[in-house]
Curated annotation (Swiss-Prot):
Membrane topology: Multi-pass membrane protein
Enzyme Commission number: 2.3.1.225
Catalytic activity: L-cysteinyl-[protein] + hexadecanoyl-CoA = S-hexadecanoyl-L-cysteinyl-[protein] + CoA
Residues covered by region (Disordered): 41-60, 192-212, 378-410
Record protein name field: Palmitoyltransferase PFA5
Keywords (A to Z) from UniProt: Acyltransferase, Lipoprotein, Membrane, Palmitate, Transferase, Transmembrane, Transmembrane helix
Ranges where the DHHC domain occurs: 239-289
Database matches in Pfam families: DHHC (PF01529)
Localization in the cell: Membrane
Source species of the chain: Gibberella zeae (strain ATCC MYA-4620 / CBS 123657 / FGSC 9075 / NRRL 31084 / PH-1)
Length: 507
């Protein structure tokens, strides 16, 4: 049996006590053989201050963090830290897609494959219509308006290049970095079993639903309570996806089209061949914007040709009418999509949020340890106790599957208990009112969180959105002033100030 073991040096326990998912190195223990796992393809990482100020000549043994209920083996990280460099901690949230993302529906797959060729034919006809006929044959050769033709060709080339670049960037991102929430080992095992049953003609639907994991050391749970704020259910636990068999990160939604949870999913776009999510939303906006500009240029050019020919008493050719009609149709569609997408950006919502505009959110907000439930709100303290273990002292870790008779196991258990005592966190469960958006951080910041910090990122498909980083120790996505408003609404702001004043007085 295989189990992931996360280890950290005791001289870096100050950070590991809060985020024990962050480690210097990750290993896999299998049949007493230690295998170093290669770094994931995509990671969220951050740097710590210079480690030399916290190094000692005799470092303490490694400290085991909570990973699973299975017997584990302590492993010293192989990577050492130079005294003059900062250590890089990696949070293992990676997109493990090895190939293109494919829909579960045959019709969607074929549409996604054929539409790019259809768009290529449309662009080819538009190029012939605007460049060859309108600019070369009519403006230059027939009516001798060379300057007008050159200006139109230049603008056409600019919009064409920008549109194609944004489309390719968006399409490739959707196929190879869709924004899927990584599967847990349990979900991968279930998928293998499902595929095996499907091959053997068995019942595959019986594997679709799975209840929430009640294990206090459930894989991925610590990633939530290591933050200060996260979206939760009424019991204080994160949302659970029964199909993916994993905890759902903030703003993640399950796509029945692909059978996966997706970070900040917006919609399935057949023109782009997949799901528009946080990894591709900014490129999608850039494409629709440049496509709108491209279509406006096509319509304007053809309309100008129609006007000149009618004023000269000449008939209007059919190819000009076709270009005018196609440009108008796709231009209106592109403009509508651009306006709608920009509205979502400025409001910091998605298409999914729009259809749930009256929804309410429950937020687990970190409060001072020891805060008790009231008539207005309930609290929950992490790490959780094992089911039925009411005798356990607050903040004391259970054995986590380590044999108490073994000396190394007892030492590991004591270290875990000490770690849990320091890592103990209490959260108040606060509920928003209908229609309130906890992620609204102001129109300017909303825009920058998706489109980027610089004007080059706004107009060129260079980088992914800043909101894809998830490297904040406060929350997965930046919360707005509504969190502080909720604290005041539930009387927690005064309580925090009171406890802070008492601590200052006692010190």
């Amino acid at each position: 049996m295989t189990v992931d073991v996360l280890v950290a040096r005791s001289d870096e326990l100050d950070l590991a006590s809060n985020t024990s998912d962050t480690t210097i190195n990750a290993t896999v223990v299998k049949d007493e053989t230690i295998i170093t796992r290669p770094p994931p393809t995509l990671t969220r990482s951050w740097s710590l201050p210079n480690a030399s100020t916290r190094r000692t000549d005799n470092p303490a043994p490694p400290v085991l963090t909570r990973a699973s209920s299975l017997p584990v083996k302590l492993v010293e990280p192989a990577t050492d830290i130079d005294s003059d460099s900062s250590s890089v901690w990696t949070w293992a949230w990676s997109d493990e897609m090895q190939g293109p993302a494919t829909s579960k529906r045959c019709g969607t797959r074929w549409i996604a494959r054929l539409l790019p060729f259809f768009m290529l034919m449309l662009v080819g006809y538009a190029t012939y219509d605007v460049v060859v006929y309108c600019c070369v044959e009519y403006f230059i050769q027939e009516i001798r308006k060379t300057a007008t033709a050159i200006v139109l060709i230049v603008f056409y080339t600019i919009f064409f290049i920008l549109m194609v670049a944004a489309y390719i960037r968006c399409y490739v991102t959707i196929q190879f970095n869709t924004g899927f929430v990584p599967w847990t080992a349990a979900r991968e095992a279930a998928e293998s079993e499902r595929n095996e049953r499907s091959t053997n003609g068995g019942d595959v639907e019986s594997l679709q639903w799975s209840p929430a994991d009640t294990n206090p050391d459930s894989p991925g749970l610590e990633a939530f309570y290591s933050k200060d704020v996260f979206i939760c259910e009424s019991d204080g636990l994160p949302k659970w996806c029964s199909e993916c068999r994993s905890w759902k990160p903030d703003r993640a939604h399950h796509s029945s089209e692909y059978g996966r949870c997706v970070y900040k999913m917006d919609h399935v776009c057949p023109w782009m061949g997949g799901i528009i999510s946080e990894t591709s939303f900014n490129f999608f906006i850039q494409f629709t914007f440049y496509c709108a500009c491209y279509c406006v240029l096509i319509v304007s050019t053809n309309a100008y040709v129609v006007t000149l020919r009618r004023n000269a008493g000449q008939s209007v050719e059919g190819r000009v009418v076709v270009g005018l009609a196609l440009g108008s149709l796709f231009g209106l569609f592109s403009i509508a999509m651009t306006v709608t997408a920009l509205r979502f950006v400025f409001q910091n919502i998605t298409n999914v949020d729009l259809f749930r505009k009256n929804q309410t959110f429950r937020l687990a907000v970190r409060v001072p340890t020891g805060t008790r439930s009231t008539d207005q709100f309930t609290t929950i303290t992490y790490p959780l106790s094992p089911p039925g273990d009411d005798s356990r002292a607050p903040g004391t870790a259970h054995s986590n599957g380590v044999d108490q008779s073994d000396g190394a196991g007892s030492i590991a258990t004591n270290r875990m208990a000490a770690r849990d005592q320091r890592a103990k966190r209490t959260f108040a469960i606060l509920q928003t009112q209908s229609g309130e958006n906890p992620w609204h951080v102001g129109y300017r910041n909303n825009f920058k969180s998706v489109m980027g910090e610089t004007i080059f990122e706004w107009f060129l498909p260079l980088r992914h959105s800043p909101c894809t980083r998830h490297d904040s120790m406060v929350s997965d996505y930046e919360f707005g002033p509504l969190v502080e408003e909720l604290k005041r609404r539930y009387g927690l702001a005064e309580e925090d100030a009171e406890k802070g004043a008492n601590e200052t007085t006692s010190s």
